[in-house]
Structure formats: structure tokens, C-alpha cells
Amino acid sequence: MLTLGRKTLSVPILQGGMGVGVSLGGLAGAVAACGGMGCISTADAGYREPDFARDPASANHRALTAEIKKAKQIAKGAGMVAINAMVATQDYAAAIRTAVEAGVDAVVSGAGLPLELPGIVGTTDVAIAPIVSSGRAAKLILRRWAKEFGRTADFVVIEGCKAGGHLGFAEDDLLAGKCQTLDDILPEVLAEVKPFEAQFGHSIPVFVAGGVYTGADMAHFTAMGAAGVQLATRFITTYECDASQGYKDVLLNARPEDVRIIHSPVGMPGRALNTPLVQALAEGTRFPPRHCARCLKTCDPAKVPYCITHALIEAVKGNVEEGLFFCGANVGRLDRMRTVQELMDELVTEWRQNL
């Protein structure tokens, strides 16, 4: 058993948050039911709501509440149900408060430094965790939390350079293959959390993500001192994943050479498949937003090359022409559909065999 805040996991596996609409209550609940941590992405969780175009904030908060309750019902008290909240999003704080009110077990936060997260969550039993890509970032966040809020992280997630979606590395370094590896970053983060473990009198488990694919990978990192791992791309090709089968088929058919590093309106690089949209953007084509929901703090709709909300919603529907399909570096290894239980059992069995 692994303690994270006031809750425990029987399996040290986190399912990474994937928006828009890829990881909602169905997937998160199934992972939690297996003893892991399922994670709902707050990014436009209400994209299917009838009033989403007119009032996205209300639609998203209503849907987020429903998805958390759905996940909890599926989990039946097992594991943990979390949300992934991106600092870069306009409704960041409001989404977290909605999730806390809905009974979420943990908030995992990245796409920027979640410096204010303890203040947003408040004096609740909800576990909090930053997503970091360096020991320096971990130290900066934990020092701020300790000084300003008298609190520390309940766990930390390291996302390495092989992760899917938004990446906390310089675009030039990603393209040149010069980023630190998880093997480099993990010891740094473990060293940085130690003073805060001593100060607050409890362990701060560290999970690694980004390129973790097998139970053998899991064994490698737990032997180095990680408490467990986070996977995302592998969970897309499960029956319980909330994306359309069309979305899943695109990833199942992807080859290693189809992966690209793209620039996101979030202001960060990202890893995605080389679809017609990505190809057109690389050639300099601009796709002006048809309708702006003001989903990002830094986005200028008059200048942005494309609307990431529209592109991700089209992807989750399976629209290859207009969709942006985020993926991890190992997407080419996906071979078939599985149930969440089958995938979790496979990972845990391989992990134990390689310990």
C-alpha cells in the first residue's frame, strides 16, 4: 500500500490526465477500481454539453462534477480519483474548486508552475502534486508552498521528455535530443524533496512519466527510488478510455516516424502525430479560431496559428483531418485494444518479475 495524503493506492500506477475528453470518468474510474490513480483532465471536460459553445465555463464545471462522480461510482472506494489541471488554462482555479467540492481525491497540476495550488485547494483532505521536469522546478514549487502555505506536496510527478502532450522542455532541446533523461532527473528530484520530507514529517512519493511503457520500465525506476509510474498513451487503447474508437484507431495505426514536436498555443512544445493539421501548420498555414472560448490565459486569438480547443475536440471525435492527436514517444508500440484491468495486470506482473 502506498499512502498519498489521506488515501492509499494498492498499485503504484497513475493514469496521466489527457484532454480534451480522452480521460474522463470512464477511464479514471476503471483505473481507480484496479487500485491505481485515475485522472480526469479538466480541459474542456464539458465539450459534449449542449451549451458548451455558448457558456463553456458552466458546461465544463457541470461536466467535471458529473465525471468525478461517475469515476467514484465505478471505483467503488478503490484507488484514487484525481484531476489534472493545467496552470495555463483560464478557469484553472475555478475548475480545481469545482473538483474539490465534487469529492476528488487528488489534484495533479502542470503546464506551468502550480505555485498557488495549496491556496486554491484550501484546508481539505485533497492530495496535491506538482508535475515537474527538473529538480530545480520541484525545489522552487515546494519552497513556495512551504513558505506561503505551510504545506508540501503529497506526491510529485516527473514528466520526462518522451511524454505526450505539453512538455516542460525547450523546443530546441527536444528537436536536438538534448533533454535530460528520466534517469538523470529522478535522482535530482529525490534529493530536492528530502528536506521537505524532513520539515513536514512525511514521505513525498515521486512518480515518473514519459516513455514508461512496460512493467520492466516500472521496475527500473522503482529500483532507482521512484514510488511508481504514470502512463497515459497506453491507456488510450483501452476499451474504457473516453475517446472515440476513431481516436484510438489513429493511435493504434501510428508508426514511430509519425511523431512530431509541435508548438502549442499554450506556449509550450508538445508531442503529437503528424496529421494533416500538423503538416499544414508546419507549412505556415493559419487556421483562425472560429469561436474563442478564452480557454487559455496567454492565447491571442487574433494571432494564434490554430485553436487548440477545436483541434483537440476534433481529435477526440476521431477527425483525422482537423484533429491534433497528442501522443507519447512510444505510440508506435501500441498493438491492440485491452481492458484497463488487463493492462494493469500486465504491468504489475512484469514489474514484479523484474524487481
Regions found by a protein language model. Give the residues of each.
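Residue-level detector of alpha-helix initiation sites
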Residues: 22, 212-213
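Conserved active-site-proximal phosphate/metal-binding subdomains
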Residues: 14, 163-182, 186-207, 213-355
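Active-site entrance/lid segments in N-terminal catalytic domains of soluble metabolic enzymes
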Residues: 1-199
